[in-house]
């Protein structure tokens, strides 16, 4: 089976490498061609356009920042939609909006292709270890065909049905939970700091009670002030918070915590923190 990976950022690069290591023929595309060089050295082929990348593949994975980025590589004369063969599969591993997921599913169906939403849970280090968790939704035939590939990239797969938007809504909700935890952890750290307790010691207490890798990992980043290099940028945290608010509005749900986190992210970005890890939320509350 031939695979193409489009988007070689912090997540796309290790995902592409794991595709190679799993023994698949790999074609890669990235807007900045320099990012393809190491993978080409390791055995991948580089394509000049998304269309050419898709033309050489049975399955195309996109791992990009947002709706606009995925739209750019999918639609248009040089988009993957024009290159992918009938019955080909587009797997979007990006965090995209519910509405855009529906648009992609419809566009591929019109071409006789399959669209599979497969957003991931995990940071770049998890991607490098093929230890991501993946939420999938889409046609059963596509999920069955893609399962061996997704198994080679992950430690666990959650199948949430045949409508792609369900997987994207689930990922958006998970990210909202993470934002809520970052908000609560930041506020707790700052309060205890005023009572003279070091953040590392408070984290030890919290970790003993909750036993959550989220608290442990992000709490350590906060306590040690190691916000660079960013595993997930604050600007992307704001993007995902806005996605959560939009998804909630669509079904008349209220997310007051998301509104609060949004204001803090916006404040941080105004202060120049947009490229820091989103755990730098703690710097936005001080």
From Swiss-Prot:
This is Uncharacterized oxidoreductase YfjR. The active site is at residue 171. The gene is yfjR. Gene3D superfamilies: N-(1-d-carboxylethyl)-l-norvaline Dehydrogenase, domain 2 (1.10.1040.10), NAD(P)-binding Rossmann-like Domain (3.40.50.720). Its EC number is 1.1.-.-. GO terms for biological process: organic acid catabolic process. One of its GO terms (molecular function) is NAD binding. InterPro entries: 6-PGluconate_DH-like_C_sf, 6PGD_dom2, 6PGDH_NADP-bd, HIBADH-like_NADP-bd, HIBADH-related, HIBADH-related_NP60_sf, NAD(P)-bd_dom_sf. Keywords: NAD, Oxidoreductase. Coiled coil: none annotated. NAD(+) binds at residues 4-18, 95, 239. Belongs to the HIBADH-related family.
